[in-house]
Design a protein with these regions (language model features):
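Short glycine/serine-rich donor-binding loops of glycosyltransferases
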Residues: 75, 93-97, 101-102, 106, ...
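Short, amphipathic alpha-helical "lid/cap" segments that border enzyme active or binding sites
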Residues: 29, 139-143, 172-180
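Acidic donor-binding loop of glycosyltransferase active sites
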Residues: 64, 80-95, 102-103
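Donor-nucleotide binding loops and adjacent catalytic segments primarily
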Residues: 3-85, 118-121, 133-142
């Protein structure tokens, strides 16, 4: 999916992963409703199976287009439908978002072993492919980051371009060219 710079509706994917959907369930829903009164947003949100009905009813009651799903459903399809993602920073999730060229706001799980989720997100941030919002600053920073993206898409499109460049640099064909060049130099 390639949103145009003039597109009115933005589709936001929210993914908490196996260990972290609760922070998003509790702390994002009111913000999404608030922003949806100013900007057209569709939310696709992963949550625990027990929370699907409540979350769906909340968004529907507040006139927010939504698709709510549990962890075991088709994740790739949800990514393809989205313009941007708020996610934990597990390596496989970030790799999937990267390959599908979806900029993301990474919220690393602070209890991850050796802080590996922060390191995963930092890799992409250094390449200008994502935003990082640490969990202890989530409530105070997420609104500003989301509004900056929704109201001025220039930084969003820069991140999409950076993801595309990163993905090209990491394609097998390009890696093979580098290997052949090295072999031929020797």
């Amino acid at each position: 999916k390639q949103p145009s710079e003039n597109k009115d509706e933005f589709t936001l994917l929210v993914v908490g992963g196996s260990q972290g959907a609760n922070i998003f369930d509790k702390n994002l829903k009111n913000l999404i409703v608030k922003i949806s009164k100013e900007k057209s947003i569709k939310i696709i949100q992963q949550t625990h199976q027990n929370n699907i009905t409540d979350l769906k009813n909340f968004y529907t009651k507040n006139n927010v287009k939504n698709e709510i799903f549990s962890f075991d459903e088709n994740f790739a399809n949800s990514i393809i439908q989205s313009d941007i993602c708020i996610s934990r920073a597990g390596a496989s999730t970030l790799a999937e978002l990267s390959v599908l060229n979806i900029p993301f706001i990474a919220v690393p799980l602070p209890t991850s072993k050796d802080n590996h989720q922060y390191e995963n997100a930092f890799f992409y941030e250094m390449k200008n492919c994502c935003w990082i919002v640490e969990q202890n600053q989530f409530e105070e920073k997420i609104e500003k980051v989301l509004k900056d993206i929704l109201y001025d898409k220039s930084n969003y499109f820069k991140k999409k371009k950076s993801l595309k460049k990163l993905n090209f640099q990491n394609t097998w064909a390009n890696e093979n060219k580098k290997i052949l060049k090295t072999v031929n130099e020797n």
